[in-house]
């Protein structure tokens, strides 16, 4: 936060407030369910056509109901889901293309958004890096915890960070550079 006359770190102040609300059990339970991106992503991906139809902002049937029950503004654009996640695609095609002898290697943590809502971004990133003669590996142990951070759930974020950092450190020890998409 740039310096200003009140010298308040507003983002951290909001995080502390949300954490305090959580401790007092005054946080929004619906928001807690929406932040379970892996559970939601796995489920919604199986029904992506129906989910995408029902979450379109132009849908005059379902969006007013979502606004009433979930407090999601009916005009808000929501991310699409795909019937195959990025990890599903990668399990089917682990090829690296034609790589010359290379020592350049990258491990990509795609984030839950790319995995469930934009798998093409991950596939294109792999393709571009392979064209640049860079070996690419992906790992996805689960959501990084950013949605929980927004809700002040510091414990969940810390638990997820521990798992992610343990996995990443193994790649770093082998000489991989780390890249995260979105």
State where each predicted segment sits.
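Iron-sulfur-cluster electron-transfer modules
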Residues: 1-143, 148-182
């Amino acid at each position: 936060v740039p310096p200003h006359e009140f010298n308040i770190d507003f983002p951290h102040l909001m995080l502390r407030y949300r954490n305090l609300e959580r401790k007092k059990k005054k946080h929004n339970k619906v928001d807690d369910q929406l932040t379970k991106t892996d559970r939601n992503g796995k489920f919604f991906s199986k029904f992506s056509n129906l989910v995408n139809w029902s979450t379109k902002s132009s849908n005059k049937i379902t969006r007013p109901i979502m606004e009433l029950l979930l407090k999601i503004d009916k005009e808000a654009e929501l991310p699409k889901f795909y019937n195959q996640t990025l990890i599903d695609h990668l399990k089917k095609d682990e090829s690296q293309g034609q790589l010359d002898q290379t020592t350049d290697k990258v491990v990509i943590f795609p984030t839950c958004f790319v995995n469930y809502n934009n798998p093409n971004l991950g596939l294109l990133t792999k393709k571009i890096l392979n064209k640049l003669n860079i070996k690419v590996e992906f790992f996805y142990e689960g959501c990084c915890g950013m949605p929980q951070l927004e809700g002040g759930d510091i414990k969940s974020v810390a638990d997820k960070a521990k798992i992610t950092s343990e996995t990443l450190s193994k790649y770093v020890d082998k000489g991989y550079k780390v890249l995260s998409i979105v």
